């Protein structure tokens, strides 16, 4: 099990607090000037991925102290506890083994003394057979036509993960097959999607472990009603709906053939489920070989994380850097900035991954934490963000550590687009690190021929303090294998931070209260009586809503 230890009471935390006093005003310009080998010293290569963390407000002593904290809180034991199937998700009494889903070795993985790999591989085999039938056109709809559109209906991890991967790997998409994703219970989402579809050639994948998720099942029933309006016979549902679930009775009641039900297990958390049967839409979108490459890339990062010494361990290093800013510099958010349009959903995916995992205020012993935990995660693809929020990162009053991600090779190498894109990628991290001081600004304005009055008026607005931290993650090309490694890298970073912060990263009780209250409010919306059972604001809003609807 994971240790229950307040990190603020450790010797390592005290040493870092003292060290922060010597580092808080050190400028990265000086760190680079003092160390010509800083890039080599603070970067790590992993296959086709290069992680450069040299543009951070740290030195070798900082890194050693952070590594010491990781050792002191028992991180190594925590990593082994996860990989060996201990029930580290204590509040739900579950193991955490999404790593088993992408275990491409012959090694067994045990939960409660039972090797789960035969079941994992059996589901993978079933996914392979099904995806090949769909892609080849051998899976026919009720009218004998092959599938041309797949609609994944899910929410949270059952939507964000597959959608992000399908978008990232669109260059590998199977020809003649389009994949759509519906998640929001707002009827607009399903209605606008259905407008694009032909019921004779559409396959729906209903992704809900229990087959009771309100948003998912509401959308699923709307999709079924639309389908039956055209197809007529409920027997045709079996050719156009499959289930990613564990509830056989509810799947059958919906009209889906249990043979077309793809199972997963309670040791797979929703936000880590894209590696499971929840990834069936991905296997159909990019082909099963591509899905296996995705798993392989993640497995390789799993091995790196489990086996590599912490000082050369990418997820550990990234996690420790995040703790340095979150808990000592007081940074409240982190930006994820991919310079690849295919990765436009990558920040949103890890917004969920990070904030749902580490957005906790109770420690593992049941007390309230005394330190900051999970950061706010946000971002947009470059160069869009440069013309939106980079102003704040460069010259605002908030410290926003940022990860910049980019491929050396584009899937669409047209003209000089990619060179321009990457020139911005390199320029932004340099500008954020170096900045531009008063003397440089004044000299630049003088070269422009500005008057001394104009110079004195303008220079304060054109100064860039710099010293803004970034990690640069450069990879050769966005392939399924590389993407798998990148996703696993961030997953493990999140886990490491949760271990150090003494919180449980694999539950999500914060989503429950709103659902409970919504279940109570829903029947109140369907009658004409004045509502008075809530606080005055909620009562007023509900009654205004009912009045507006007539």
Swiss-Prot record:
Associated pathway: Carbohydrate biosynthesis; gluconeogenesis; Carbohydrate degradation; glycolysis; D-glyceraldehyde 3-phosphate and glycerone phosphate from D-glucose: step 2/4
Keywords: Cytoplasm, Gluconeogenesis, Glycolysis, Isomerase
A single Gene Ontology CC term: cytosol
Cited Gene3D superfamilies: 1.10.1390.10, Glucose-6-phosphate isomerase like protein, domain 1
S-adenosyl-L-methionine keyword on record: no
Top EC group: isomerase
Protein name in the entry: Glucose-6-phosphate isomerase
NCBIfam families the record matches: PRK00179.1
Entry similarity comment: Belongs to the GPI family.
